[in-house]
Amino acid sequence: MNPIYINHILPWHSITNKLSSPDHYLLAMDVSDKSGEATKITIQEPKADTKGKGIAGALTAPVVVAAKAAQRPRKGWKKGAAIFDLTLRLSAIAAGFAATSLMATTDQTLPFFTQFFQFHAQYTDLPTFLSFMIVNAITSGYLVLSLPFSIVCIVRARAAGPRLLLIILDSVMMALTTSAASASAAIVYLAHNGNSSSNWNAFCQQFNNYCQQVSNAVVASFLAAALLLSLVVLSAFALRKMK
């Protein structure tokens, strides 16, 4: 048998183009034997059967599953952070309302009095305590109004707009609450201990219930400020993870 010599082969890019098509392809070669007689050989490749498709699907499936597995933890983390944000807001609302109600109901009258004086103390006697009550009432109202935005962050975990708005307003309310609580804490300290240099006498020994209720209100306000700080840190961390 005479050897066959290949004179011409289709270019490689044309072969690969045909390989990528779902239909069968024809690979044509011009060959010639030693006598110079040209012969054309055609090789037909059948269509990819279902078994081949199954193999191709098996090869691509791990990539899709890996991508979904990589996205699911991130989305779950963001949703969990949003739920934790809502929980912190509810706790801050409770602390803010507690501080407001405790200060608003602070009132004590001593059982003894003179012909010209009656010993009575309430929060409106000091402008610091009045400002404290107003600031905590505003903070509590803001936290209630911020609940829908927190719920939006749960439903749409990748929404950056509501989080950015919340982090700005939370920072403002945290600053107001902290300043009001700090000023009231200074007054409470003087009420308990007095100041001999300024000749301010401690009056909490006489108005014990009054001072105790004011102290509880200040503690609740500091708790609300700490929860607001936690909300700011949580929102900032969530925004950083969105990049």
Curated annotation (Swiss-Prot):
Extracellular-side segments: 101-131, 185-216
Main location as per UniProt: membrane
Keyword terms of this UniProt record: Cell membrane, Cell wall biogenesis/degradation, Glycoprotein, Membrane, Transmembrane, Transmembrane helix
Signal sequence residues: none
GO biological process per UniProt: cell wall modification; cell-cell junction assembly
CC terms in the record's Gene Ontology section: Casparian strip; plasma membrane
Localization per Swiss-Prot or TrEMBL: Cell membrane
TM annotation in the entry: 80-100, 132-152, 164-184, 217-237
Residues bearing attached sugar chains per UniProt: 195
Membrane topology: Multi-pass membrane protein
Residue numbers on the Cytoplasmic membrane side: 1-79, 153-163, 238-243
Molecular function GO terms recorded: protein homodimerization activity
NCBIfam families listed in its UniProt record: A_tha_TIGR01569
Subunit (UniProt): Homodimer and heterodimers.
UniProt cross-references to PANTHER family, sorted A to Z: CASP-LIKE PROTEIN, CASP-LIKE PROTEIN 1U1
Function text: Regulates membrane-cell wall junctions and localized cell wall deposition. Required for establishment of the Casparian strip membrane domain (CSD) and the subsequent formation of Casparian strips, a cell wall modification of the root endodermis that determines an apoplastic barrier between the intraorganismal apoplasm and the extraorganismal apoplasm and prevents lateral diffusion.
The family this protein is said to belong to: Belongs to the Casparian strip membrane proteins (CASP) family.
Official protein name in the record: Casparian strip membrane protein 4
Species annotation: Populus trichocarpa (Western balsam poplar)
Phylogenetic classification of the source organism: Eukaryota, Viridiplantae, Streptophyta, Embryophyta, Tracheophyta
